[in-house]
Amino acid sequence: MKARATSAASLRALAAGALVLALAAPSAAAARDTLTIGITQYPSTLHPSIESMAAKSYVHGFTLRPITVHDAEWKVVCMLCERLPTIENGDAVPETAPNGNQGIAVTYRLRAEAAWGDGTPITADDILFAWEAGREAATGIGPAELYRSLHRITVIDARTFTLHFDKLTFEYNAINELRPLPAHLERAIWQADPRAYRTRTLYDREPARPGLWSGPYRVVATQAGASVTLERNPAWRGREPAFRRIVIRTVENTAALEANLLAGQVDMIAGELGLPLDQALALERRAATRFRFHIQPGLVYEHIDLNLDLPALADRRVREALVRAIDRDQIVQRLFEGRVPVAHSFVNPLDRMHDPALPRIPFDPEGARRLLEE
């Protein structure tokens, strides 16, 4: 339903969200020690900082832990660090950056139990290596702006380091994208040839190396284009995972993926990379007693981008008239069975920046006609 044109403006969304929808077999599956999950994409790389793919992020949710993350309430919290640095607690101190801008120095201390899957502690050197590789343009690690703004790292001790940014933002302490890299395994490969590192990384050549992983699970086997197999990480010091083994199986065709679920070849379909909503709703009508369905609106929104180079569309009244002329509530009811909200702005209601007081444009054909007559 998404249509696009060359423009930065957009017609207010038809519906907020590609849904996150999960399908799971009944509780009998929970008694087994292996969980098989079906998704529609296979990651092109397993390296934490090279390329961005939903399938890779899904695997990393089991196998890696970032320094910070946004929790379910969209608050920044520590995962690998002991406490979140803030200006108020003194761990973040505004400073003047080399470029003359207002910058900030942010100090983190890693948890003592944080370790790679081979038992090697995660240290400040792993952060330093990730930064060094990220600053090298030839390596192709992203996001580029993070590594540009982070102009210096001061290592205080094995677990403590200070990040120096050349600008002060409202999320100065959110370093979700600064992903630690196991320097004891990867640094020598990178130093040998930064440009070729993306094709020589152990994350793709030897992904079953335990020392690449820091989450409750580690990768033990991969079958290119078909599956990634995970097992519990013995070096993990958090709560023991529920399953001994997880198999993430790729089935790109959604009809075949549904057939795999019905045949019991997968135990669940991931909402992030699963069935389109219409197919999932049809399956729910047919098999509601066999599976548990969980539908959650996502943060993306279906919308139409408009080309403001066209004189007619450059007029705000025309764009508002288009919104008033579309019965978006009816679209949501007909296409999505009312499972998603109408998007009244580009900020999803799940986002903490959402303002419920913003004015809403209703379905108003007469109002649309008056605006066009002007």
Question: What are these model-derived regions, one by one?
Answer:
Residues D33-Q41, E82, G103-R109, I127-A130, ...:
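Short, well-ordered beta-strand elements
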Residues A13-A25:
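Bacterial N-terminal signal peptides
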Residues L84-G140, I156, T162, L257-N260, ...:
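Aromatic- and charge-enriched surface segment that lines or borders ligand/interaction sites
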